[in-house]
Swiss-Prot record:
It is an enzyme of class 2 (transferase). Belongs to the methyltransferase superfamily. RsmJ family. The keyword S-adenosyl-L-methionine applies. It is found in: Cytoplasm. This is Ribosomal RNA small subunit methyltransferase J. Pfam families: SAM_MT. Its EC number is 2.1.1.242. It comes from the Bacteria.
Amino acid sequence: MSQKIDTSELVVDFVGGAVGHRFRSGEGRGQALAKAAGLTRDATPEIVDATAGLGRDAFLLASLGAKVTLIERSEKMHALLAEGLARAAEEGGRYAETVARMTLLLGDSSLLLPDLKPQVVLVDPMHPPRGNSALVKKEMRQIREIVGTDPDAERLMQVALEAAQNRVVLKWPLRADPMVGLRKPSHQILGKSTRYDVFVKAKLS
């Protein structure tokens, strides 16, 4: 029987820590995530983050000017996100401007995406623990305790590929095998521990 993880300390924080640092550093649209999502000097697509989690990717994209809809099906994680967004908005300035471009929804992305018809969909499934779970960051263990794994990730990707107007981005472990059942991505953008499999349907304008 697996040990239950204490999630009471988990907080969604867009102001401090790594997120706040990235926000203040102003790395811009040259970052891997931004490039994968199609943000360029001439294009700022509307994006749906279909697996919101802690909302960090969505916040980064919104800070770069994109309108981002976050979908989270876990009620507890949705509540943590709502609290984090409210705290960021209270900071005012660029934080408030960024939050104003974000819309948080509670629900199943597979059901919501067809009606939203977004330009870009970002999918970042929760992966089963690999190797010794003690080596996995505490925060990630807490998130997994709340949202579980995503055994329906392939189905979500298929729905996303149908619903997206322009592209779907799958955030995936760098050295992991491709997700079963998907066609070959149009291209990949590689990070230090993550890769973005990009499935292009139409050019962004």
